[in-house]
Amino acid sequence: MEALKTATFSPMSVLSEKRSEPRKPFSLPNLFPPKSQRPISQESFLKRFNGGLALLTSVLSSATAPAKSLTYEEALQQSMTTSSSFDSDGLIEGISNFVTDNPLVIAGGVAALAVPFVLSQVLNKKPKSWGVESAKNAYTKLGTDDNAQLLDIRATADFRQVGSPNIKGLGKKAVSTVYNGEDKPGFLKKLSLKFKDPENTTLYILDKFDGNSELVAELVALNGFKSAYAIKDGAEGPRGWLNSSLPWIEPKKTLSLDLSSLTDSISGVFGESSDGVSVALGVAAAAGLSVFAFTEIETILQLLGSAALVQLAGKKLLFAEDRKQTLKQVDEFLNTKVAPKELVDELKEIGKALLPQSTSNKALPAPATVTAEAESATATTTTVDKPVPEPETVAATTTTVDKPVPEPEPVPEPVPVPAIEAAVAAQVITEPTETEAKPKPHSRPLSPYASYPDLKPPSSPMPSQP
C-alpha cells in the first residue's frame, strides 16, 4: 500500500521540499579557498565548479522566467549531468560561434590591445646612429653643429691630384685619415688620437667615390662615436662635393712629401706615447726643411741679398754723416783700386784694335818713298834736341850729283821699327819743341834720277820661289 501511495503522489519540486534542518542563507560555493587551507584535488575542484555552474544557471533561469516544477527523474538526470566531467569541446565551439557572430567586437579588442604595444615600440626605439647624407646637407650641418667634424678617408695620391674640401669658412678643418680595410683596429686607434671626445662627436665621412664611407660610418658609430654619416657620391661623384659646387682647395704644383708612412713607422717603434710623436714630428720637420732649402736655394739667396741691401741702406745711408763717409769710401775704392786697372785694360784694347800685329815675314822691302818717309820720321825723332842745319843737306846733294854714279849694290833690308815703339814715339812727341827745325819745302825732287833720264834705279831682287 505504501508503494502504491508513493506512486500516486504528484511530483514536487526539489527546492520546495521541506527539511527538518533550519534553512541556511543562500551563498555561492567557495571556488577559491584561502591560502591557509589545504590544496584540493582536480576532481573535487571540477565537481564544485560544475555544481556552482548548475546553481547559477538555475538562478538565472528562475529570475528570467517563472519557476517550473521538476519531476524526480528530471532532477536526478540534471544532477547526474552536472556531476560529469567538464566539456571542453562545447566551450571551444561556443567561443568560435561568438567570434563568427561578433567580428567587429573581436577586431576592436585586438586593435585596442595591439595599438599601445606598437606605439611603445616605435616611441621607445632609438634612432639609427649611422646613415647617408648629401654633400649640401653635410656642409650645412657642419656649419650649424659645433660637434660635427669632416673626416676625409681618401688616399694621399688623391689629395695631390684632385685637392681637398675647404671648410675654413665654417671655422673648421677637415681631418685626414687614410682608411685601410685590412687594419680596422689601427684606423680606430688613429681616430681616437685625433678626436678627444668621440661620445659627443658626429662625423661626416668623405671618400673618393668607392663606397668606403658607408662602411666607415657604420664602423665608427658602433665603436664609440655619437653618430656618423657617409657623404653621398663622395668627392668626385655626380652629386658629390665637387659637382655640388661646394668650397674646394685646388692641388698645389710644388714639391710635396708624404711623411705619413715615416710617422707611422716611428710611432710603431716608440709606441703611441708623446715621446714617439714628438720624435716623429721632429724628423718630419727636419726632412721637410732640408728639401725646401734644397729646392728653393735661389729664392733664399735673393731674400738674404735683399735683407743685406736693406741693412746696408739703413746703417750707411740713412744719416748724413754715415752717408758722406760711405760715399767717400766708395770713391776711394773706385779711384785707387778699380780705375787704374780699367784704364790699363782699355789702353791695351785700343792698341790691339788700331795697331797691326807684328809678324815676321820675308816679303819685298817697301818702296823708296816709304823708306824716305821712315828716314825722315827717324830724323825728326833723333834730331829733336839738335836741329840739323839745312846747308849740309844741300851740299850733300850737290856732291852726290857731281860724282859719277857707281853700280848699284844690293840694298840691305831695312830693319823694321816695332809698332809699339812707333806708337809710343807718336804719343810722346805730340808737339814740336822750340829748338826743333821745321823742314822747308823743296822746290826740286830729292831723287837724282829725275835730272838724268838715262839712268834707271836698280831693280829689286825677285823673291825666291818655293
Curated annotation (Swiss-Prot):
It is a multi-pass membrane protein. Residues 373-384 have a biased composition (Low complexity). The keyword S-adenosyl-L-methionine does not apply. Keywords: Chloroplast, Membrane, Plastid, Thylakoid, Transit peptide, Transmembrane, Transmembrane helix. The keyword Plastid applies. GO terms for biological process: photosynthetic electron transport in photosystem II. The chain crosses the membrane at residues 103-123, 277-297. Residues 1-35, 373-392, 426-466 are annotated as: Disordered. InterPro entries: Rhodanese-like_dom_sf, STR4-like. Residues 1-15, 16-69 form a transit peptide. Its main location: plastid. Residues 455-466 have a biased composition (Pro residues). Disruption phenotype: Slight reduction in rosette size, yellowish inflorescences and siliques and small chloroplasts with irregular morphology and no starch grains. GO terms for cellular component: chloroplast; chloroplast envelope; chloroplast thylakoid; chloroplast thylakoid membrane; chloroplast thylakoid membrane protein complex; cytosol. Expressed in leaves and stems, and at lower levels in flowers and siliques (at protein level). Disulfide bonds: none annotated. It is found in: Plastid, Chloroplast envelope; Plastid, Chloroplast thylakoid membrane. Residues 144-250 form the Rhodanese domain. SUPFAM superfamilies: Rhodanese/Cell cycle control phosphatase (SSF52821). Component of high molecular weight thylakoid LFNRs-containing protein complexes containing LIR1, LFNR1, LFNR2, TIC62 and TROL proteins. Rhodanese domain-containing protein required for anchoring ferredoxin--NADP reductase to the thylakoid membranes and sustaining efficient linear electron flow (LEF). This is Rhodanese-like domain-containing protein 4, chloroplastic. The gene is STR4.
